[in-house]
């Protein structure tokens, strides 16, 4: 993408006005999954992700974090997950034992606005509800 189409900061990273990022109960954000090397990439903007599911691409964590506003969205319950993403949100937002490698969502812990339904927020504690 040409610089004239997208602002670039002094570190050579693109600057998006908004990054709306999905999160999984396993802590993946975009297609940055736990215990995979893509999570630690620091220079590339976009990464290929080759997994058992169809191959995909994802923004790197530095690009996600370089957005002017970051919103992480988590919602939905199912028969398989009757409490939705509650455990994942607890681990992403308050669990001290998690690392970027084991739970990529912690990389956005202090920089994002977290939007979730009641089920996803149910394990966060009163200070978050």
Located regions from the model:
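Conserved phosphate- and dinucleotide-binding cores of soluble alpha/beta proteins
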Residues: 1-129
């Amino acid at each position: 993408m040409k610089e004239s189409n997208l602002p670039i900061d002094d570190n050579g990273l693109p600057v998006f006005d908004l990054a709306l990022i999905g999160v999984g109960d396993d802590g993946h954000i975009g297609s940055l999954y736990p215990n995979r090397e893509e999570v630690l990439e620091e220079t590339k903007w976009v990464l290929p992700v080759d997994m058992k599911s169809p191959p995909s691409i994802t923004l790197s964590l530095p690009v996600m974090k370089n957005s002017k506003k970051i919103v992480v969205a988590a919602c939905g319950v199912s028969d398989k997950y009757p409490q939705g993403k509650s455990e994942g949100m607890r681990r992403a937002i308050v669990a001290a034992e998690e690392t970027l490698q084991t739970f990529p969502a912690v990389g956005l812990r202090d920089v994002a606005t977290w939007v979730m339904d009641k089920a996803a927020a149910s394990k966060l504690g009163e200070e978050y509800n």
